[in-house]
A protein has these predicted regions:
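Structured core of small recognition/catalytic domains
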Residues: 87-151, 156-160
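HotDog/MaoC-like acyl-thioester-processing domains
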Residues: 2-12, 16-65, 128-182
Length: 182
């Protein structure tokens, strides 16, 4: 999902699907014909294989795995995060807002000490997940670099349930604020 411009309360949003090849479909969210957000839905299998070889990236620093039971605080997480869409609650499936929160957990457990800023995420959803199961969160740091604002890390986060991939996220953050070089 890529958010390009705000959608205001009361805006009529047109969701327009367009085939883009390889069986993928881009869904564009338009307000008065202006593109506000888009996502690309890929067919199952092969698109984001679990266990990808990261030899094309600067790093391949594997972080410890984490098992997260999708109960308690995750059941109503979307509502607390401001997404009042009742569809997921009625269907008893995990709301998509949970996945970047789990990726944030990777950052706070392993990469940051103190203040930090989440800068971007590219999220690919592979399957709906029922509430109450446990998710395996696997993460690999694939890039680190310094900017004027601080040190950044890019992490590939793979989330699976019962061995099946449900979400992959490329999660980037400023993990150390302030100039990193003298």
């Amino acid at each position: 999902m890529e958010f390009l411009a705000p959608v205001e309360a009361g805006d009529l949003v047109d969701c327009v699907p367009e085939p883009v090849g390889n069986g993928s479909v881009e869904v564009q969210a338009l307000v008065d014909g202006d593109l506000r957000a888009r996502l690309v839905a890929h067919p199952p299998g092969g698109v984001h294989d679990m266990g990808k070889d990261w030899s094309d990236r600067p790093l391949s620093e594997r972080l410890p795995d984490h098992v997260e039971p999708l109960v308690d605080q995750w059941i109503n997480y979307a509502e607390r995060a401001g997404a009042d869409l009742a569809l997921c609650a009625k269907a008893a499936v995990v709301h998509p807002s949970v996945w970047p929160a789990l990726a944030n957990g990777v950052m706070t457990r392993h990469l940051v000490d103190g203040s930090w800023i989440h800068t971007s995420s590219r999220i690919a959803h592979h399957a709906a997940v029922p509430v109450g199961v446990s998710a395996l969160v696997e993460a690999t740091v694939v890039d680190r670099f310094d900017t004027r604002s601080g040190s950044r890390a890019v992490v590939d986060v793979r989330i699976s349930v019962d061995g099946l991939p449900v979400v992959t996220i490329e999660h980037e953050a400023l993990v150390s604020l302030g100039p990193s070089a003298p």
